Amino acid sequence: RACIELGEDCDGYKDDCQCCRDNAFCSCYEFFGEKNGCGCAVGH
């Protein structure tokens, strides 16, 4: 399956952002209700 490496962009709408790492997720910041700067990040 295709997966996204840590630090790569993700769309912010898939909970796991199809990250290659099991404990990673799609981290975004919201700007006026829009998701921006989404990237694959490791959960804490």
Curated annotation (Swiss-Prot):
Q: Report the source organism.
A: Ctenus ornatus (Brazilian spider)
One Pfam family of this protein, by short name?
Toxin_34
Q: Which cysteines does the record link by disulfide bonds?
A: 3-20, 10-26, 19-40, 28-38
Which InterPro entries does this UniProt record tie to the protein? Omega-agatoxin_II/III_CS, Toxin_34
The name on file for this protein is U17-ctenitoxin-Co1a
Q: Which GO terms describe its molecular function?
A: calcium channel regulator activity; toxin activity
What's in the domain note? Answer: The presence of a 'disulfide through disulfide knot' structurally defines this protein as a knottin.
**What is the reported tissue distribution?**
Expressed by the venom gland.
- What does this gene product do? Omega-agatoxins are antagonists of voltage-sensitive calcium channels (Cav). Toxic to mice by intracerebroventricular injection.
Where, subcellularly, is it found?
Secreted
* Similarity comment text for this entry: Belongs to the neurotoxin 04 (omega-agtx) family. 03 (type II/III omega-agtx) subfamily.
Cellular component annotations (GO), alphabetically ordered: extracellular region
Query: Keywords assigned by UniProt?
Result: Calcium channel impairing toxin, Disulfide bond, Ion channel impairing toxin, Knottin, Neurotoxin, Secreted, Toxin, Voltage-gated calcium channel impairing toxin
Query: Where is this protein chiefly located?
Result: secreted
